[in-house]
Amino acid sequence: MDMQGAIRLVTEGTDLTEAEMTEVMRQIMTGEATPAQIGGFLIGLRMKGETVAEITAAARVMRELATRVTVDEPHLLDTCGTGGDASHTLNVSTACAFVAAAGGARVAKHGNRSVSSSCGSADVLEAAGARLDLNADQVAECIRRVGVGFLFAPQHHSAMKHAIGPRREMGVRTLFNILGPLTNPAGAPHQLLGVYNKHWVVPVAETLRALGSRRVLVVHADDGLDEISIGSDTLVAELNEGEIHEYRITPEQFGLPRAELSDLQVGTAEESLALIREAFAGWEGPAFNIIAINAGAALYAAEKAPTLDAGVAGAAELLRNGSALRKLEAFVRCTREV
């Protein structure tokens, strides 16, 4: 299917088959499609509404074209979310990666610079002193040595360069805003994945089921966070061995007090890192609590905790005893040694 035909179909409201979407995505990712065609197609697709089949096909093409990170670990975990919730809160998903690694998970943390908040995973890790420009073998070595590696998206998804211009110029969310967490270059089958809109909670879980993931928690909070919130209830779609279950969780069920989002907001990567370090030093406040509840879910997703309750309790202890802080420091050293 050529780009003009695909644009015609989606603007008429017709869903593409997986085979058709695969052809279109290959043209976008290999530079065959023009910027105008890319923009027109993405907008048409958004107005129609992306289907699970279309998202699955697009993710498969991106995975195929990515620079792979090969690690001999069947239970790799990723905590990458979509970003884009405009909350300007500390980078919870990054903090969770180190708590989960301290709890025995092997973590391939996929991430990038900021989408719409003050800082993304890459910004925070750079502020901590980590090198971001590692190649696939160096990332794999960090995972082997310290249990966590950072997969900086531009290093692994070079084919994305063809879509960057149109996406930036359009300035609206498109299919690509949800593809990042679906295209981990290490193929992590376990995930805690926050999405920027509740509309995506179940479709993303269904997409990951089609892609072969094992245990995933897709989350969106009522207060808008693409994390499990301590300021509101959170909607969860749990994928576990092919079955998807929806439920809601609250901070109270884990014995945590509610907090205002303003208690978690930061203006720079350095401020985000400072809040993370406070939590990693065992200082119990809103930052500690939101990291604990999300890291607990990550431990459960990685099958390192039998229940969410056990995961949250375990994550809190890893924060209190300094294990998460030591893991962060070991990771930063590893990025500078490999």
From Swiss-Prot:
Q: Which InterPro entries match?
A: Anthranilate_Pribosyl_Tfrase, Glycosyl_Trfase_fam3, Glycosyl_Trfase_fam3_N_dom, Glycosyl_Trfase_fam3_N_dom_sf, Nuc_phospho_transferase
Q: Which domain of life is it from?
A: Bacteria
Q: Which GO terms describe its cellular component?
A: cytosol
**Top-level EC class:** transferase
Binding site residues for 5-phospho-alpha-D-ribose 1-diphosphate: 81, 84-85, 89, 91-94, 109-117, 121
Q: Which UniProt keywords apply?
A: Amino-acid biosynthesis, Aromatic amino acid biosynthesis, Glycosyltransferase, Magnesium, Metal-binding, Transferase, Tryptophan biosynthesis
Report the pathway entry. Amino-acid biosynthesis; L-tryptophan biosynthesis; L-tryptophan from chorismate: step 2/5
- Cofactor binding note: Binds 2 magnesium ions per monomer.
**Can you state which reaction this protein catalyses?**
N-(5-phospho-beta-D-ribosyl)anthranilate + diphosphate = 5-phospho-alpha-D-ribose 1-diphosphate + anthranilate
- Positions binding anthranilate 1 in this chain are 81, 112
Residues annotated for anthranilate 2 binding in this entry: 167
Transferase as a keyword of this entry, yes or no, is yes
What biological-process GO terms show up in the record?
L-tryptophan biosynthetic process
Cofactor section: Mg(2+)
Q: Where does Mg(2+) 2 bind?
A: 226-227
Q: What EC number(s) are associated with this protein in UniProt? A: 2.4.2.18
GO molecular function, one example? anthranilate phosphoribosyltransferase activity
- Keyword presence, Glycoprotein: no
Which sites bind Mg(2+) 1? 93, 227
Q: How does it assemble?
A: Homodimer.
The entry assigns this protein to a family as follows: Belongs to the anthranilate phosphoribosyltransferase family.
Protein purpose: Catalyzes the transfer of the phosphoribosyl group of 5-phosphorylribose-1-pyrophosphate (PRPP) to anthranilate to yield N-(5'-phosphoribosyl)-anthranilate (PRA).
Question: In its UniProt entry, what is this protein called?
Answer: Anthranilate phosphoribosyltransferase
The species is Alkalilimnicola ehrlichii (strain ATCC BAA-1101 / DSM 17681 / MLHE-1)
The gene from which this protein is expressed is trpD
